[in-house]
Amino acid sequence: MTKKVAVLPGDGVGTEVTKGAVAVLKAIGERFDHQFEFTYGLIGGAAIDEAGTPLPESTIETCKQADAVLLGSVGGPKWDRNPSHLRPEKGLLAIRKELDLYANLRPVTFYDSLADASPLKKEYIEGVDFIIVRELTGGLYFGKPSERRTEGNKETVVDTLFYKRTEIERIIRQAFDTAVNRRKKVTSVDKANVLESSRVWREVAEEVAKDYPDVELEHMLVDSAAMQLIRNPKYFDVVVTENMFGDILSDEASMLTGSLGMLPSASLTADGPSLYEPVHGSAPDIAGQNKANPIAAILSAAMLLRHSFGLEKEAAVIEQAVESVLHAGHRTADLADGNHYLGTDKMVEAITAVIANDSAISSIMTAYS
């Protein structure tokens, strides 16, 4: 198989973790005789510095000509005082719109070997395995108008929460399609006691549920969902919600694993290249120090293989390799208890070594033979 992957390292640790993810994809290519061609583009602060815009046209074209996109991270204090249209995050929002990346999937998985890294007791998180399906191209982040105004001598501000019914339907349908292959339960999260958009959200969820009689649907207010994620995270299977709620809840859920550095994500489109990125930010405080955890980016590469290329076995091998190195006690700085930890590069080397080891991945190879 020959596929093109557009790589957008971005800012901060993004350059380091995408380098690790590319190394793992190359190891998979060698192991399974696939050819992955990598092209690179600018986004975020790096693009502002070099091209004067957070998302150059050349980057858009690079992405559209690829079969999938691998992103690092964007942002940093260097650009915090820039005008709104020259903020690094605008590049991320723009690429989502350009590629119509409407569905963001964020799996949250418990690793037994990382139980001590979680702020919750093991009995609360053991067995946690759920996925947040977040709508990604509507809501407050994209609604217009979004501006400051002067009315008389007073400054006012306005943001707009805007959704089309079709946008709500397609993300909820994505959640049900995901649940069919899991434990067949969808928790739809909203604020229907206050927001009209959430009341429409509930109506659409009920309509879509009729097409999936084997999948259970429940509604939950976002404040209750935020509480349940900590109180009883094993309760959830598939959580579907609008853009801002999903942004907040998925970051909250990330701490169940002990570190943002463990959580991958996929941003899917119905037609064209989908985008894969770690949930964590650019972490400028550790950028360039070989301290970043590359696992979220590497697991994002596994999601890329699964969702964009249909390479389920290869994705499972990456996930097994990650689990193996964690079980062996290898940790990056964010997960380590003390001063003994692997640098970014050594963690990548440990994972690629497992991929190349026949005995280490024999169970996966047998399962898919």
Curated annotation (Swiss-Prot):
PROSITE patterns: IDH_IMDH. Mg(2+) binds at D223, D247, D251. It is found in: Cytoplasm. The keyword Amino-acid biosynthesis applies. Its EC number is 1.1.1.85. Pathway: Amino-acid biosynthesis; L-leucine biosynthesis; L-leucine from 3-methyl-2-oxobutanoate: step 3/4. The keyword Magnesium applies. GO terms for cellular component: cytosol. It is an enzyme of class 1 (oxidoreductase). Keywords: Amino-acid biosynthesis, Branched-chain amino acid biosynthesis, Cytoplasm, Leucine biosynthesis, Magnesium, Manganese, Metal-binding, NAD, Oxidoreductase. Substrate binds at R96, R106, R134, D223. Its main location: cytoplasm. One of its GO terms (molecular function) is magnesium ion binding. One of its GO terms (biological process) is L-leucine biosynthetic process. Disulfide bonds: none annotated. It comes from the Bacteria. The record marks Y141, K191 as: Important for catalysis. Binds 1 Mg(2+) or Mn(2+) ion per subunit. It catalyses: (2R,3S)-3-isopropylmalate + NAD(+) = 4-methyl-2-oxopentanoate + CO2 + NADH. NAD(+) binds at residues 76-89, 281-293. HAMAP family: LeuB_type1. Belongs to the isocitrate and isopropylmalate dehydrogenases family. LeuB type 1 subfamily. Homodimer. Catalyzes the oxidation of 3-carboxy-2-hydroxy-4-methylpentanoate (3-isopropylmalate) to 3-carboxy-4-methyl-2-oxopentanoate. The product decarboxylates to 4-methyl-2 oxopentanoate. This is 3-isopropylmalate dehydrogenase. It comes from Priestia megaterium (strain DSM 319 / IMG 1521) (Bacillus megaterium). The lineage of its organism: Bacteria, Bacillati, Bacillota, Bacilli, Bacillales.
